[in-house]
């Protein structure tokens, strides 16, 4: 589960491009963004580690900067209209 600090960190990074994002998207629940290039915009904000998938649905493993001395990995399932972010904390 994301801490309050990391939740704000991720939300702020995403809202740089999207303006406003429903909080459920940051809790591992789907959020409709209606952005055709949502995956690319996320890629612009986070370092891409792995891409698994095709041109329509992709699974990304992203790593943020250090947050409270932890590395946060985010598995991101996304298509044109939905994003599902699942946080994985690596001590």
UniProtKB/Swiss-Prot annotation:
Superkingdom, taxonomy of origin: Viruses
Name of the molecule in the record: Putative protein p22
Native species: Acyrthosiphon pisum secondary endosymbiont phage 1 (Bacteriophage APSE-1)
Name of the coding gene: 22
């Amino acid at each position: 589960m994301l801490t309050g600090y990391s939740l704000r960190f991720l939300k702020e990074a995403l809202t740089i491009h999207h303006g406003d994002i429903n909080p459920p998207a940051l809790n591992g629940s789907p959020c409709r963004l209606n952005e055709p290039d949502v995956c690319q915009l996320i890629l612009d904000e986070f370092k891409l580690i792995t891409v698994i998938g095709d041109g329509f649905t992709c699974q990304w493993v992203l790593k943020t900067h250090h947050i409270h001395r932890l590395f946060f990995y985010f598995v991101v399932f996304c298509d044109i209209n939905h994003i599902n972010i699942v946080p994985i904390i690596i001590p």
